[in-house]
Each structure stands twice: as C-alpha cells, then as structure tokens.
Amino acid sequence: MNKILNKINWLVAIILVFAISSCKKFIKEELVTTLTEDYYKTDAGLEDLVKSAYVPLKWRFEGEQSYCMTNFGTDEFREGDQFNNVRYNDYDANLNSNDAFVNGLWTNNYAGIRRCNQGIELIAAFNDASSRLLGTQAQKDLRIAELKALRGFYYFQMVQQFGGVPLVTTVPSQPQYEFPRATVAEVYIQIISDLKAAGPALPWRYTSADRGRATRAMAYHFLAKAYLTRGSAVTDQRGQKPTDMDSVIYYANDVIANSGHALEADYGALFSAGYPDGVIPPLGENGAAPLSNKAKIDANNASNEIIFAAQFSSNLNLASAANNQTHLFYPTQYDAGMPGMTRDFFNGRPFRRLRPTDYTIDIFDKINDSRFFKTFQTVFYRNVTSNSGLAVFTAANAPNPSLVGKPRVGIGDTAAIFIVNPANMPILTSTIANMRYYAVYARNKQTAVGQPVTTDFSANKYLTMWKFSDPIRLTTTNNEARGIRNGTYARLADTYLVIAEAHGRKGDYTTALNYVNTLRNRSAYKTNEARSPQIWQYMGGPNTLANTSANNLATLTLFTTNAPSELYPPTVASTEARFIHFMLNERTRELCGEFYRWEDLVRTETLLDRTKLYNADVSPSFAAFHKLRPIPLLQMIAQTVNGQPMSPTDMAAYQNPGY
C-alpha cells in the first residue's frame, strides 16, 4: 500500500479538491491532468482514490506543525533555545486566523474528507461483477468502510482543534459557496456514526502489505476516544450523554479483547531504534561510536501495539517531499559545548525546538518505572575520532598509572551525562569536578551543603526525548531531515488509558487501576534488566537489578489523597478531580510527547490551569478562548453568506471567540 500512496502524492493535489472552500466541480479539476473522470469509474481508479484518502495523514508529521499543535502550549514541554512558532507555546497575538499551520490542518483534513466523500459515492455506484477488486458487495463494503473510518477520524481531528466545523458528507453536484459551521454536538454525531458504521465491515488488523489501512481496531479505538472526549465535558457543550462512558468501555474493551493487537513486552521496544547498539570500551581504550540499524526502525514500525499510523517510505523514489521530520525537534545541542561530541546520524540533527518542563521530569518514578529512561536520553557517547583537545588522565586522577596521558573518555564511552537528581539530593560542585566525563549537567547542584541549589539544565542543554529519534533517515547526508519512521496516531496503550479513565469517571476506581497497572507492570524493571546507575548514585534507589513491579503499582491513595508524587494543582480538592489529573499524569508517563497532550488538556478542561502552572513560557495573554484554534481566514474569504462575500460582521460571527 505504501508504494501506491507515494506514487499518487503528486496526483491528489491536482485532481482532488484540496480545500473545502474550492468551488470547482470534480470534472473541472480533472481537466488539468491527463486523467479523466472516467478513470474514477474503473476499479483501478477507485482503488487509487481510496488510497489517496490516506495521504493527508502524513501532514502532521512532515514539519513543525507536529509539535506546535499538540505539544507546545501545554504542561509537558516548553521552548528550547532555537524555538520557532513560539505563538503556539506562548499564546501571543501572532496565533491568529492567518496562521499557516491552522490553515494546513484545515485544508489537509478537508482534503481527506473530500476524497472520502467521493470514494463513498463512486464505489456505491460502481457495478461490475467481473472486477477483481470491487466485483462483490463485500469488496465494495470494505472500501466504503475504510473511507467512513477515515472521514470520522478527520472530523475528530477537526472538532478537537476548531470546535464546530462545516459538515460535508456528500460531493456537491453544483458549485457550493456557503459552508455554515455545524455545532460541536452535531460533529460528534457524525464522527460516531461514521466510526460505528465502519467497524463491522473492516478486519481487526492487517499484518502485511495492507498495514496502514483503516481497520476495525482503528475505528473502535477512535470511537472510544470520541465518546470519551464528548463525555468528558463539564462546562463545554459537546452533546455529551450519560451513556458515553459505557460506550467508551464497550468499544475500548472490544479492541483490547478481540483485535489481536498486543502490548509490547518491553516499553522500549516501541522506540528502540533510538537506543545505542555497542559496548562501552575499557578505560583508556577506543571502541565504536553508537549506531543503530534500519532493522530496528522496521521493527518499531511493525509493532503489533500500533493500531494506526501514517506510512512513510525508506525508498527515495517513493518517499514524500518531507517525510517524517519529528526527529528534528527534540534533541539538545550536543554538537556544541560538549567535548568529544560532534553532529552525527545517531544523535540527530538538533533543531532544539522544545524541552521537557520540570513537571514532565518530576512526574516519573525514575527508580521503579523504566519509562523515564526509555523516553529521555541522559547519556551521550563520544563520537569524535581525534583526541586533540580532549582531557586526559593525569597522575592525580588516573585510576591506575597505565592510564596517565590517555583520554579520560574513549570513543564510544560516556562523554556527557545529564544527572536528573531530585531537588532534595543536590550534588556538590566539587563532586562534579572530580568526575571523568567531559561534560556533566546536574539538574540540582550546590557549592556546599546549605548553599543555594542551582541547575545546569538550560534552554540548549536539556533532556532529549528520543521516542522519534531516526538514526537512519532517507539519505546518508548528515543534515538529512527526512526520516523513515511511521507517524503513530494510535497504539494499544492509549486504549488501556482510555478505558481506565472511563471506568474512573463512573466511580469504578478499582477497575480503572487494573488497566493502569497493566501498563505499569509492563514498564517496571524486570529482574536483571539493565538500568541507569543514576538510580542508586544520585536518586537514593537501591543498587540492585531486582524486579520493581510491586513498587511500581498504582494504588487508590494516589488520588484519594493529595499524594505529593502526583503534583496536583492546588485547586484540585476532590477524589473525582484528582482522578482526572492522575490520569493526565499517567498519560504523560506513558505517552509523553506523542502528539496527544494539547487535545487531552482541552478534553479535560484543564488546559488553562495546568499550562499556567507548569509552563513558564506562556504569556499573560493566555486565556480560556485558546482552547480552540482560529478558523482560517482563507476559509472565510472564499465563501459567501446569502450569495454575498462575508462581511466583517459575518466573519466575526463565524470565527471562534477571542480571535
């Protein structure tokens, strides 16, 4: 399927309507190409049309919109020192209806919706019993179900970012110029209808060439999330119903129990392409700089935990113009100011756009929960081949005389370390000075006991999130930006958290914790599993390789009391409210950075409180209206009201409040 998707990248932007505001008929769009409308009356043409409906899925991962619209402006991340698009993190006046990402989200999703509408109508009308592809009703039903699942998904993305949007579910037979916004409740009715209708005709999952297509697991996962989002509303009006949480539980359980998808045994198996291969050399000796290999990325992409992902190709001839670029935005500046380090493929191209907040670092149990060290890179291994200018062992600090004059760090050994010690365990600067590493960044340090605690963490020296690290990429050019990881939209761990939250919202905290603890059992250190020495050197943890499952389990007291480990906002006073914040914390621990956070905070009506509390970069202009994005100006100037261009008054009425 990926091959076909990439072949038609050039095609769909011309043939199919890219934005809902276009008034051209389908036949007029066709005339600018060598194809005719008749091509889409053939089974091959209809197959290509279906596949074209997947192309807009890639947009999220192809540039800086990825983090801007999901991770910036939340409690999890703040700005690095080379920040772009700061308006999404600070919520300043530059976030407005002229914004390129707002327009891109709108046009890409409506491009997908348009293709879905066309495919649904044309396939329903197709009648050729001799067709190998669409000759039976079951074959037609399968493709129509795919398109309905995608349409529901695209509308779900839209309603979470914009609120009410125009609902278009047919291909207009005449030019259309007016697109009134439906209410949020009406959009959710459409989303739920599409995803419900799609599920029964789809297979639970694909395991080979068709991986990446919509499946029943995909439809029901997002159906559960749609019910959860609608039913989470307290002050917002989303058309919520008393049965929404029951529906969440029903569909999420169906995915968990019947889809054939399974959690990875090791949390790190989802992201292992970013982890180093190789052996640290003996002191004074050179080894090899860390490497990865394409097989690890292929394994990450093929994980059975992944329910739905945008597909990216590693074939230069088939790849999109941008491919997956999310690996660019999280690395710290390791290639300057870190002796022994230079830019390489393994550590990535450090755009330094965003760094984790203190909340994000503190919310993990670093001693018992492996997710922290499998999410954040704390060690950089020397990759500079020349010893010139690098510190050597002296007679005063060499562990044995044979090492005098040799580099303190050989190639492949630890050149720099980020120590994530807690504030109540600061490291003395004299201790840091005696470490053999070329660079040490302590989160908490002091010159002497009782003196002020300071930090080495900064806007360009911070913890790198390596979930999206891509040490292979499309070419071997050192600054190659086009990655080859797929872009994950849904994995089974999220389904577990969705069903857990639904049970908790119904007051069944015991069942909620059962699902949470399934993930915590997975992420606990196993007996003899390697772990960071920081645990016992700087955090007060035990110097053992014991199983930590028992210590990693969540208990009721984490939200029935004001547990210090959960960092609850001071305004949160009830068990019910603490449970919601506990689930947000659990989503950070499991899903940090995976492009959910802004929508999670909006869904739970906590965006304003949590972002103000934990993100030091937000501006004073950050306000409640920022829970929605502005409607693109391009949409408004391209349509009419009662046959006339939109007036300023019409635009103000059409626009979201505050913009």
Residue ranges of model-derived segments:
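Acidic, glycine-rich segments characteristic of secretory precursors and extracytoplasmic regions
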Residues: 2-4, 23-78, 89-92, 96, ...
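Long, intrinsically disordered, low-complexity segments
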Residues: 20-26, 54, 95-96, 109-112, ...
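Short coil/turn linking the two alpha-helices of tandem helical-hairpin repeats
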Residues: 157-160, 164-166, 229-238, 507
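Conserved, well-structured interaction surfaces
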Residues: 43, 47-60, 81-162, 176-189, ...
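An aromatic- and glycine-enriched ligand-binding surface/loop that stacks and positions planar moieties
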Residues: 24-84, 229-434
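C-terminal substrate/ligand-recognition segments
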Residues: 99, 103, 370-374, 378-524
